[in-house]
């Protein structure tokens, strides 16, 4: 009974102490020693996490759809232009055709001149004139026997060109060359103010120092022709070279000379005239007249026939620059069937 009463007394005291304790203001901060009050429901609810707003994705720029058009056909590559043939080859073919076929070859000659004009227009004009001189040679050129005709200029504008002839092996002159010189002497006396040009190189097999021109000039001087009038060209070995080197000398050293008269054997006059005319044309600008003109000839008489068409072709081919083909044509070694027959 006493023990029960004691426990009741203790409980009563504790209850009274709790009821008498002062209340803590709501606004007062809790000290570390104080026990925190129970959290509210709001405090227990976590704050919502902010969700980042995505940046707007830029809309792609619309690409214009190409409107189909008519596509032109690709241009094919140009056909390569073939290299033109060398001029000398065209001249050779042209000369051989005309020498072989004569008037029948005129169409072929025109065709070859057209080919030449496409690549060498200035040369084509010159060679057209040369071929015309060849075609009309026989009807244009009359051979004067013994002396030059009357009416030529008796001034230093005229040059009498004496063509050489092969020397004997010891360097002396053959009779035919003396015959040419006798004609040249008559011409020099008839036109005493004209130059006399001797042309021809070394052709003596046993005396290399002897030249046709040297022998001729010595002979003329001994016969009374003034040395101031006598000109010497002693490097040429063919008639085509006679023409080229003589023209070169006159144009270079004697620009006063405007006309030449050729002295040779009768069979040789026409071919020589053609070569000198051709060389004069080749030295002339297209559209101009040659600086030197062949105006006359004089010849010693022989029993020989005129030089062949092959010989004439050979001289022109040599003037064009092909000495080997020229030699073959001149000495009848050339294959005249080299080019196809004409229809």
Model feature map: region roles:
Residues 1-8:
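Bacterial N-terminal signal peptides that target proteins for export
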Residues 78-159, 244-343:
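Extended hydrophobic blocks
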Residues 195-197, 217-235, 281-304:
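A non-catalytic structural micro-motif
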Residues 19-83:
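Ser/Thr-rich, Proline-interspersed low-complexity disordered segments
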Residues 165-173, 205, 229:
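Surface-exposed cleft-lining segments at the edges of enzyme active sites
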Residues 9-18:
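Bacterial N-terminal signal peptides
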Residues 158-166:
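N-terminal nucleotide-binding beta1-loop-alpha1 segment
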Residues 174-193:
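Histidine-anchored nucleotide/phosphate-binding helix
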